């Protein structure tokens, strides 16, 4: 049995007031330049803040139709990497939305640089939520040794 996606992909799926998810295409892990035949699903979360800015958590591969759908929900303002693995497509989104703030989690800048990723981060996530989403989203850093991840609560 092959792997399957959470259809439909690249479509915003409302999960509650001002929050939804978008399932993306399969991704494949590459180690030492070798693409492994192990597909994994991708998903991003979109939160509309009280000022109508959008908080995009772990952006999936960019798709123009999805970007247009999200424009109808609000202004894409925050592109957030919750950990050093979920940043791969932030660069694609930031090229289309250059006014968006790109948020780096611990170790993501170093990992992106080592992998020659085409992404520039404008701010670093800190323990306390930034003023930009403090009224709508709380956050905490989950310390897992080498792997640290920000967890967000809406």
Where are these regions (language model features)?
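A short secondary-structure junction signal
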Residues: 59, 91, 114-116, 148-153
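Short, surface-exposed beta-edge/turn micro-motifs
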Residues: 42-44, 147-150
